[in-house]
């Protein structure tokens, strides 16, 4: 197993776990209390609480990254494409979040970087396959 594959498994797995945990935390406590989030962050957004953002985070970022992790672990066809798409979803999620609530946490920037790293790794895996 090479460094690109190991790095991909680690970063995609970390992102999946974080997004699933964060999304479920928002769904189970839409006030944001489990994550120490204030609903005041949502002022000016279309959301009154974290329920809908939690569902989106869980389904689109968390489960998509979980699918990418399964593809990576099982070495399924189209793994690189699934991984790249999951990274793109994460990037879109973070950009939309920044547009809606603005810059609040360093994690927003960190996860934008994570999305870029995931895209880079997916491209590297694709190159190694050729």
Predicted features, each with a name:
Residues 2-130:
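Topology signature of small-to-medium multi-pass alpha-helical membrane proteins
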């Amino acid at each position: 197993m090479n460094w690109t594959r190991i790095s991909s498994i680690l970063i995609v797995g970390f992102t999946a776990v974080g997004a699933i945990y964060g999304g479920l935390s928002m769904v189970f406590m839409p006030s944001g209390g489990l994550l120490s989030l204030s609903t005041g962050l949502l002022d000016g957004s279309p959301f009154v609480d974290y329920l809908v953002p939690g569902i989106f985070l869980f389904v689109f970022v968390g489960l998509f990254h979980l699918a990418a992790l399964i593809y990576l672990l099982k070495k399924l066809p189209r793994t690189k494409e699934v991984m790249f798409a999951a990274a793109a979803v994460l990037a879109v999620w973070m950009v939309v979040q920044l547009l809606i609530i603005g810059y609040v946490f360093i994690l927003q920037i960190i996860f934008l970087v994570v999305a870029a790293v995931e895209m880079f790794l997916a491209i590297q895996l694709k190159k190694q396959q050729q």
